[in-house]
Amino acid sequence: MLLCLTLLFSASAVLAMPTPEGSPHHEIYKVCVPEGALESCHRMSQESDLHMTCVAARDRIECLDKIKHREADFAPVDPEDMYVAAKIPQQDFIIFKEIRTKEEPDEEFRYEAVCVIHKDLDITSIHGLQGLKSCHTGVGRNVGYKIPITKLRHMGVLGPLNNSDLTPRENELHALSHLFSEACLVGKWAPDPAQNQALKAKYPNLCALCEHPEICDYPDKYSGYDGALRCLAEHGGQVAWTKVYYVKKHFGMAIGAGEAVPTGQNPDDYAYLCPDATKKPITGKPCIWAARPWQGYMANHDLDNDIADLRAKISLADTIGETENADWLSKVLDLNNKTIPIDNQGPYSPENYLNKANYTDVIERDTGAPHRPVRFCVTSDAELEKCRVLKRAAYSRDIRPAFDCVREAGLHECLRTVRDDGADVITLDGGEVFVAQRQYNLKPIVAEQYGEHGSLYYAVAVVRKDSTYQSIEDLRGAKSCHTGYGRNAGWNVPLYTLLSKELISKNSCPYSSALSSYFSGGSCVPGAQLPENNPANQNPDSLCSICAGNLDAPNNDPAWKCSASNDESFFGYSGAFRCLASGEGQVAFVKHTTVPENTDGHNQAAWTAGLRSEDFELLCADGGRASINEYSRCHLAEVPPHMVVTSNDKTDIQLNEIRHAILAAGDLYSRRPDLFKLFGDFGGTKDLLFKNSATGLLSVENGSPLMQRYSEILEVIRACENQPTP
């Protein structure tokens, strides 16, 4: 009989209660969940006698850190998460339980990759694959792509994958195209649509066996695990890469404890091709090329004496969750009505768990030297740490080229480093993109997307609801807060607004002095006094007069005041709003998402405590005010997005591989923020690498409509450049 265990629940920090003397078990088990699953986790702890409580993390990668540092006890993980965990220094992780299917609860691996051929195929060496017709599940997939590429390369069958004139993906496609005479390899060969089509036009033989060779994408009769076997049996294929489960299903063989279901396909006409080129009967034990491990649960060695109890608790949770049809079963424990948690023979270390499936090299898929990573240039320690975490996470998820990180002191140092090939990319505000193009020979290649607004955002003026300002004209003499010098929402747009309304004369050069005079109460314009922004020493000191330096540092270094980095607390969107919210400023020039992101509990930073969005309003360009959510009718301008820029000196091949990696990361992590939160807070800091408000990324070219949106604003605010200073 199950004892009714006392329910313990905490919605915030979780502390394990003292273990009663003589008890072999934890009083409470702390399960780590990505923040998006926290509410479901709380329901789990409230609704069941599971002796579990919840620890929220940014994503699965942060869960690994929390388990390592004993802030959490366990979490569900994928093999890719295990790979990341195995690379963490001084870790003591253990995989103690697995998530298997009810159909195959006794199988050691989630699936086993096999090569199936016609039994009478004349092949005596693995090199005999040369010139054959090959059927694959799809590009980028484990069984039909990663595993054969990895293993055939190690065997010397597949050609070199390190041609510096080709991207990593094209190296693979080129090698497959020269190994096989024809194939069916559907899917997106590149995340950029134009590049995808160009590759398919270049290697058409890799689509020749597909149902629709001219499309070569899903859905296709000859794609997927079962489609690869149909391609072999019906469409002229000579070799198929699939998994054992679908071989059994295709040929009507028994699966797990189930009975055989005849399909009309004769298994005696086919055979497994082994890595040593021998053949084995389809009806016998398969020879596998590699296996994908099951998902599982990871803990640390502090749980060694509690593993049996924790295993039982997870199994109990599965029973309760299925009975109640609870959403937390999938969101918290990664289980569903087709899976079952199974005790393994371990616990195993993550490394040993992957190695027993021969899977580590499949994740790594090293193409060989020279390695050409995509190097992000960053300007703060917080951004550097996020970049390093992205590097590890993306590598485990097969995003190639790999990422790397370069730290510089500030924006212009980064721009020089990218120009001089010390780094490859940096993400910039639209106004900074203009500087990068004009002064550093850089160009945008990828743009952020913002949900329903696409690749634009609204620049807005925010005031306190209890203020008396009713128009831009009323702001004369006010204290102003800006995101940064030369940035779109914080500088270019308000300057353009004042000029277009003739509140500043178009002849009053330099405009920095004119704007300073208009906001005579003082301003914070981070970066205004940097030499590169103030070469003639014309920018007034008042542009930095209400800046604060680093309010969160134990010792506020005077050098930080008005710096164009997070060392200035009033820098960036959140910083400019903080300047307003703290009472230092009376208007903040930011983007339309800034106030919602920093009020009503959406930002956990101490300075946002108690801030309510209803206490702030938008100041409309043509007069009047509006609530924060009415930005579509009350804004100063629609402006282009933040963009990733690189050097104009990059070759087309280099541009393609940079785009490929960045777009692939954007695609994966916009769909699965639980794996890694690319768009969102990191360590309590906003807008690192990409803006919090971004929802995805897309390729952009010079001359596109995105770039054309700069023209009017830039033309107006640059009018002083060709005029002599009074």
Swiss-Prot record:
<dbReference type="InterPro" id="IPR001156">
    <property type="entry name" value="Transferrin-like_dom"/>
</dbReference>
<keyword id="KW-0406">Ion transport</keyword>
<feature type="binding site">
    <location>
        <position position="573"/>
    </location>
    <ligand>
        <name>Fe(3+) 2</name>
    </ligand>
</feature>
<feature type="disulfide bond">
    <location>
        <begin position="41"/>
        <end position="54"/>
    </location>
</feature>
<keyword id="KW-0732">Signal</keyword>
<keyword id="KW-0479">Metal-binding</keyword>
<feature type="glycosylation site" description="N-linked (GlcNAc...) asparagine">
    <location>
        <position position="162"/>
    </location>
</feature>
<dbReference type="InterPro" id="IPR016357">
    <property type="entry name" value="Transferrin"/>
</dbReference>
<feature type="disulfide bond">
    <location>
        <begin position="135"/>
        <end position="231"/>
    </location>
</feature>
<feature type="disulfide bond">
    <location>
        <begin position="207"/>
        <end position="216"/>
    </location>
</feature>
<keyword id="KW-1015">Disulfide bond</keyword>
<dbReference type="GO" id="GO:0046872">
    <property type="term" value="F:metal ion binding"/>
</dbReference>
<feature type="signal peptide">
    <location>
        <begin position="1"/>
        <end position="16"/>
    </location>
</feature>
<keyword id="KW-0410">Iron transport</keyword>
<comment type="similarity">
    <text>Belongs to the transferrin family.</text>
</comment>
<feature type="glycosylation site" description="N-linked (GlcNAc...) asparagine">
    <location>
        <position position="337"/>
    </location>
</feature>
<dbReference type="InterPro" id="IPR018195">
    <property type="entry name" value="Transferrin_Fe_BS"/>
</dbReference>
<feature type="domain" description="Transferrin-like 2">
    <location>
        <begin position="374"/>
        <end position="719"/>
    </location>
</feature>
<keyword id="KW-0964">Secreted</keyword>
<feature type="disulfide bond">
    <location>
        <begin position="481"/>
        <end position="562"/>
    </location>
</feature>
<dbReference type="GO" id="GO:0055037">
    <property type="term" value="C:recycling endosome"/>
</dbReference>
<feature type="binding site">
    <location>
        <position position="483"/>
    </location>
    <ligand>
        <name>hydrogencarbonate 2</name>
    </ligand>
</feature>
<feature type="disulfide bond">
    <location>
        <begin position="32"/>
        <end position="63"/>
    </location>
</feature>
<dbReference type="GO" id="GO:0005615">
    <property type="term" value="C:extracellular space"/>
</dbReference>
<feature type="binding site">
    <location>
        <position position="642"/>
    </location>
    <ligand>
        <name>Fe(3+) 2</name>
    </ligand>
</feature>
<feature type="binding site">
    <location>
        <position position="111"/>
    </location>
    <ligand>
        <name>Fe(3+) 1</name>
    </ligand>
</feature>
<feature type="binding site">
    <location>
        <position position="489"/>
    </location>
    <ligand>
        <name>hydrogencarbonate 2</name>
    </ligand>
</feature>
<feature type="binding site">
    <location>
        <position position="225"/>
    </location>
    <ligand>
        <name>Fe(3+) 1</name>
    </ligand>
</feature>
<dbReference type="GO" id="GO:0005769">
    <property type="term" value="C:early endosome"/>
</dbReference>
<feature type="domain" description="Transferrin-like 1">
    <location>
        <begin position="29"/>
        <end position="367"/>
    </location>
</feature>
<dbReference type="Pfam" id="PF00405">
    <property type="entry name" value="Transferrin"/>
</dbReference>
<feature type="binding site">
    <location>
        <position position="490"/>
    </location>
    <ligand>
        <name>hydrogencarbonate 2</name>
    </ligand>
</feature>
<feature type="binding site">
    <location>
        <position position="457"/>
    </location>
    <ligand>
        <name>Fe(3+) 2</name>
    </ligand>
</feature>
<protein>
    <recommendedName>
        <fullName>Transferrin</fullName>
    </recommendedName>
</protein>
<feature type="disulfide bond">
    <location>
        <begin position="387"/>
        <end position="405"/>
    </location>
</feature>
<keyword id="KW-0813">Transport</keyword>
<feature type="glycosylation site" description="N-linked (GlcNAc...) asparagine">
    <location>
        <position position="358"/>
    </location>
</feature>
<feature type="binding site">
    <location>
        <position position="78"/>
    </location>
    <ligand>
        <name>Fe(3+) 1</name>
    </ligand>
</feature>
<feature type="binding site">
    <location>
        <position position="144"/>
    </location>
    <ligand>
        <name>hydrogencarbonate 1</name>
    </ligand>
</feature>
<feature type="binding site">
    <location>
        <position position="141"/>
    </location>
    <ligand>
        <name>hydrogencarbonate 1</name>
    </ligand>
</feature>
<feature type="binding site">
    <location>
        <position position="143"/>
    </location>
    <ligand>
        <name>hydrogencarbonate 1</name>
    </ligand>
</feature>
<feature type="binding site">
    <location>
        <position position="137"/>
    </location>
    <ligand>
        <name>hydrogencarbonate 1</name>
    </ligand>
</feature>
